[in-house]
C-alpha cells in the first residue's frame, strides 16, 4: 500500500473519567443519545399498543429501531425478516479492512451513522506489551495507515493500536442502554452489559448500515434467563455464561436474543453483565442483554458519562422489560432458564468446545477420566471477555495472596488488559505489580492469544498439553495452532489460581498448595471492587478523531501489495454454472469459521482476498479421509483423484471453469463473524454450501456474497454424497422464498440420486444472488453500477 501523505489535522482526544484537570472528558455522540431517548417512549408505547401486550426489553429495543421501510406489526419470531436502523457501527482492524474496501465502492462521502475502527487484532503476543506493540506498528504499518486514512476520509473514529480491544472500548465510550448497534466481530454482544442490543455481523452488513440502507435480520426469538440469589466466594459472572453454555450448547441460542432478568441480574456489575453477553456468541445467540439498573448507572458515571446516565434515568421504565414479562416469563419468552447464583459453582469449560461445562467439583475427575494432560502449562487472563477493572482486581487479590503465602506461578501466566484506560488505572492501583510479582507477564491491550496472535513459548509446538484462559473460545488450534492443545475456559480468578498451582486438577475451593517453605497453604476466595475507588485515569486513550472534511484525503492501494487488494465485484451465479459441479470439501464434524478461514498468522492478509484465500478450509476435516487440507481433485483426470490442499484444489477447478460446492454438518460456520469465510470460497469458485444447519452470522455472510446457502431437507442425505460425484443443483431460475431446490448426484458408476434442499432466502436476499452479491445490489441502488 502507498498512501499519499495526509495533510488533514487529526484532533486527538484524551478520554478518561476523573481528574479533569489532567484529562479532557467527552461524551461521544451525545446528540444521537438524546434523540434516541426523546423518541423512545412514544415508539415503545405505540409498539405495545399494536402488539396488544406487555413487551420484553428485547422487543422494546427492536421495535424502537425498526427502519421506516418496516411497518410496526406483530412480527413472527424466528419467521419474519425485518428491516432495522441500528444507531452505530463498530469494526475491528481485521474485519474493517474488507468492510471498508467494500464501503469505498459505494460512492458516499461519509458514513450514515457514527462508526469506529479499533486496532486490536493485529498485535502478536510474544515478549510483552511494549515490545509487541512496537513490532506490530512496524509490521502492520501499511494496514494501520490504510485504516487511519479511510477513517479520516469518511468520518470514522479511529482507535489506534494499543488503545484496547474493540468491545471494552465500546463499553467504556459508546454503549448506552436501549440502543442498537452492529459490529464486525462476533463478540459485539458484549455491549449488552450496558443494556444494548448489539449484534455481531459480517462486513457487508456493516456496509448496509454505513451507507444508510436498511439492515435486515430475521425477527429473533427471545430466551429468558431468570437469575436469583447472589454470587459469592469463587463464583463470578463468567460462571453464569459457562453454565448457560452447558445448558443451551453451541447452537441452542441460534436465532434468539437472550434476555437476563431477575434479582440476581441486578446484583451483577455492569462489566460482569458484559462478560455474560459477550460469551452469548458461544451459544449461537443473536445477542444478549440486560435491563438498565443501578450498576449500569454507576458504570456510566464512572466512565465520564453522567449526562448519559441522567438521560437514561428519565426513561428507565422503557429500558427494561415490562413487569408482566418478568412476573410470568413463560407467557412472553420462547424458552425460560432459571439459575440460582447463590448455589452456582465455578465452572471450567472445554476442551475444544465452549459448551462442555464442568462444575469445578467434577473437573478433576474429568481430567483423569479423559486423560487430559494434568500439568497446566499456561494460564492466560484478560481478553474482551474478562479484562475489566473488577476482573483484574479480583484476580490480583489471588495473586497478592500467593505472594503473601510464598507462592509463585508454576505455569506461564499472562495478563491482557482490555483497554489503555484499564491498563493505566490498574497500573496506578497496583494490580499489574501483583501479577508481575508472582511471575506474570503483561501483554498489550489487544486480542493476542485469544485469537491465535500468540508466539507461544514452547519446546514442542505439537505436543499434547493443557492451557486455561479467561477468554471465550477454545476451538482446536485456535490459540496456538496446535491441535493437541487442550484449551479450557474459566474466570480470571480461577485461571490465576490454577496457574499458581500448575495442575489442572487443583480445586481452590478445597485443595491446599505447598509453598516455597514447604508449608501447606490455602487460597482464600477472591475479593475485588467493580470500579476503581480513585476513578479511572489515562494519559492517552488512543482515540483519533476524523477530519471535519475528509474530501481532500486520497487513498491509494499499491497493486503489488500483499496486504491490501481492491475488490472486483462478484458476478452472479448462473444456472449452467450449477451443472457438473465438483466437491471442494465435504467437511466432517465441527466446521467453524476458524476451520474455514484461520486467524493467527493469516490475519495479515485480511485485506487481500486473493492471498487470504490460500487458507480456505485448511483446518476442516475431509469426511473421506479424516485428514485436514487433503482433498481429491479431478481436473487432471476425471476418473482418478489427485490429492492436494483445499485452496490449490479450488484454484485448479476455477482455472478449469468447473464450479465447486461445499458440504458440511451441524452448526456450520460457528464462531467468528469474519465474512472472509464466505468471500474466500466465493473467490475460489464455490457456488453453493449445503449443510445440515448453519450458524446465523455465517449463513447471512454467505447470502451477502451471492452464494447459495442450502440445508438438507433430510440430514441423512449427507451420507449419500460420494467423493467423485458430479453434482447439479436445480431450481436457481425459479428460486423463491420457501421453495425447495434439488441436488442431483451423478455417481461414477453411472447411477444418480436426487434429494431436496431448503433455504431461508427472502426476496431481497434472492435479489442479492441475482446481482452477484449484496454489495452489488447496494451499488445498483445507489447508482454506482
What are these regions (language model features)?
Residues 5, 11-22:
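Short, positively charged and aromatic/hydrophobic N-terminal segments
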Residues 17, 513-530, 698-768, 775-778, ...:
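Acidic, glycine-rich flexible loop/linker segments
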Residues 28-29, 93, 176-310, 406-407, ...:
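Mobile "lid/hinge" segments at catalytic clefts and subdomain interfaces of large enzymes
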Residues 33-36, 40-220, 607-662, 667-669:
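Long, structured ligand/cofactor-binding scaffold of large enzymes
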Residues 134-138, 143, 148-152, 156-183, ...:
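Accessory "access/gating" subregions that flank catalytic or transport cores
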Residues 261-267, 651, 655-694:
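Extracellular/luminal Protease-associated
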Residues 492, 525-648:
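Long, charge-dense accessory insertions within large macromolecular proteins
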Amino acid at each position: 500500500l502507498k498512501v499519499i501523505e495526509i495533510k488533514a489535522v487529526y484532533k486527538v482526544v484524551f478520554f478518561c473519567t476523573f481528574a479533569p484537570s489532567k484529562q479532557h472528558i467527552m461524551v461521544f455522540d451525545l446528540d444521537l443519545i438524546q434523540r434516541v431517548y426523546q423518541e423512545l417512549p412514544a415508539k415503545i408505547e405505540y409498539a405495545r399498543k399494536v402488539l396488544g401486550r406487555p413487551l420484553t426489553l428485547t422487543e422494546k429495543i427492536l421495535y424502537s429501531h425498526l427502519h421506516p421501510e418496516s411497518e410496526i406489526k406483530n412480527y413472527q419470531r424466528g419467521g419474519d425478516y425485518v428491516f432495522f436502523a441500528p444507531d452505530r457501527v463498530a469494526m475491528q482492524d481485521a474485519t474493517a479492512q474488507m468492510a471498508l474496501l467494500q464501503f469505498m465502492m459505494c460512492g458516499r462521502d461519509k458514513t450514515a451513522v457514527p462508526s469506529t475502527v479499533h486496532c486490536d487484532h493485529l498485535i502478536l503476543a510474544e515478549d510483552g506489551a511494549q515490545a509487541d506493540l512496537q513490532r506490530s506498528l512496524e509490521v502492520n504499518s501499511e494496514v494501520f495507515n490504510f485504516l487511519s486514512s479511510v477513517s479520516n476520509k469518511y468520518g470514522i473514529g479511529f482507535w489506534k493500536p494499543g488503545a484496547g480491544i474493540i468491545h471494552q472500548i465500546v463499553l467504556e465510550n459508546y454503549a448506552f442502554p436501549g440502543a442498537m448497534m452492529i459490529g464486525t466481530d462476533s463478540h459485539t454482544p458484549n455491549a449488552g452489559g450496558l443494556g444494548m442490543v448489539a449484534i455481531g455481523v459480517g462486513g457487508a452488513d456493516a456496509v448496509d448500515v454505513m451507507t444508510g440502507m436498511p439492515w435486515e435480520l430475521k425477527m429473533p426469538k427471545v430466551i429468558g434467563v431468570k437469575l436469583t440469589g447472589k454470587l459469592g466466594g469463587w463464583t463470578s459472572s463468567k460462571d453464569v455464561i459457562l453454565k448457560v453454555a452447558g445448558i443451551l450448547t453451541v447452537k441452542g441460542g441460534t436465532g434468539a436474543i437472550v434476555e437476563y432478568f431477575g434479582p440476581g441480574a441486578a446484583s451483577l456489575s455492569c462489566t460482569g453483565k458484559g462478560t455474560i453477553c459477550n460469551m452469548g456468541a458461544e451459544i449461537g445467540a443473536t445477542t444478549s442483554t440486560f435491563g438498565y439498573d443501578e450498576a449500569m448507572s454507576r458504570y456510566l458515571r464512572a466512565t465520564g458519562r453522567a449526562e448519559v446516565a441522567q438521560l437514561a434515568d428519565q426513561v428507565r421504565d422503557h429500558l427494561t422489560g415490562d413487569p408482566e414479562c418478568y412476573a410470568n416469563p413463560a407467557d412472553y419468552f420462547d424458552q425460560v432458564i432459571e439459575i440460582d447464583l447463590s448455589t452456582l459453582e465455578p465452572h471450567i469449560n472445554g476442551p475444544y468446545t465452549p459448551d462442555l461445562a464442568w462444575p469445578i467439583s467434577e473437573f478433576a475427575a474429568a481430567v483423569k477420566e479423559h486423560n487430559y494432560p494434568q500439568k497446566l502449562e499456561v494460564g492466560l487472563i484478560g481478553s474482551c471477555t474478562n479484562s475489566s477493572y473488577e476482573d483484574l482486581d479480583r484476580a490480583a487479590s489471588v495473586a497478592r495472596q500467593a505472594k503473601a503465602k510464598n507462592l509463585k506461578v508454576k505455569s506461564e501466566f499472562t495478563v491482557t488488559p482490555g483497554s489503555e484506560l484499564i491498563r493505566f488505572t490498574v497500573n496506578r492501583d497496583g494490580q499489574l505489580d501483583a501479577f508481575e510479582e508472582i511471575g506474570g507477564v503483561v501483554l498489550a491491550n489487544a486480542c493476542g492469544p485469544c485469537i491465535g496472535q500468540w508466539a507461544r513459548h514452547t519446546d514442542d509446538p505439537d505436543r499434547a498439553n493443557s492451557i486455561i484462559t479467561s477468554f471465550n473460545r477454545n476451538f482446536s488450534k485456535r490459540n496456538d495452532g496446535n491441535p493437541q492443545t487442550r484449551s479450557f475456559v474459566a474466570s480470571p480468578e480461577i485461571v490465576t489460581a490454577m496457574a499458581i498451582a500448575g495442575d489442572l486438577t487443583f480445586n481452590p475451593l478445597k485443595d491446599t498448595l505447598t509453598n516455597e517453605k514447604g508449608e501447606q497453604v490455602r487460597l482464600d476466595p477472591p475479593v475485588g471492587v467493580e470500579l476503581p475507588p480513585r476513578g479511572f485515569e489515562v494519559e492517552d486513550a488512543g482515540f483519533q478523531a476524523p477530519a471535519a472534511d475528509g474530501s481532500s484525503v486520497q487513498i491509494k492501494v499499491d497493486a503489488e501489495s500483499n496486504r491490501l487488494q481492491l475488490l472486483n465485484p462478484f458476478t452472479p451465479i448462473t444456472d449452467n454454472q450449477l451443472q457438473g459441479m465438483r466437491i471442494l470439501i465435504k467437511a466432517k464434524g465441527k466446521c467453524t469459521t476458524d476451520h474455514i478461514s484461520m486467524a493467527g498468522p493469516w490475519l495479515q492478509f485480511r485485506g487481500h482476498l486473493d492471498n487470504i484465500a490460500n487458507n480456505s478450509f485448511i483446518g476442516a476435516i475431509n469426511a473421506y479421509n479424516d485428514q485436514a487440507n487433503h482433498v481429491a481433485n479431478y481436473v487432471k483426470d476425471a476418473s482418478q483423484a489427485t490429492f492436494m490442499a483445499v485452496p490449490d484444489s479450488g484454484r485448479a477447478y476455477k482455472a478449469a471453469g468447473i464450479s465447486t460446492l461445499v458440504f458440511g454438518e451441524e452448526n456450520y460456520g460457528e464462531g467468528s463473524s469474519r465474512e472472509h469465510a464466505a468471500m474466500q470460497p466465493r473467490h475460489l469458485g464455490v457456488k453453493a454450501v449445503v449443510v445440515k444447519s448453519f450458524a446465523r452470522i455465517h449463513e447471512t455472510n454467505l447470502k451477502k456474497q451471492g452464494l447459495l446457502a442450502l440445508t438438507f431437507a433430510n440430514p441423512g442425505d449427507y451420507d449419500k454424497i460420494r467423493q467423485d460425484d458430479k453434482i447439479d443443483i436445480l431450481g436457481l431460475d425459479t428460486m423463491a422464498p420457501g421453495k425447495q431446490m434439488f441436488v442431483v448426484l451423478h455417481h461414477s458408476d453411472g447411477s444418480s440420486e436426487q434429494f431436496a434442499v431448503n433455504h431461508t432466502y427472502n426476496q431481497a436476499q434472492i435479489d442479492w444472488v441475482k446481482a452477484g452479491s449484496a454489495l452489488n445490489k447496494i451499488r445498483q441502488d445507489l447508482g454506482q453500477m
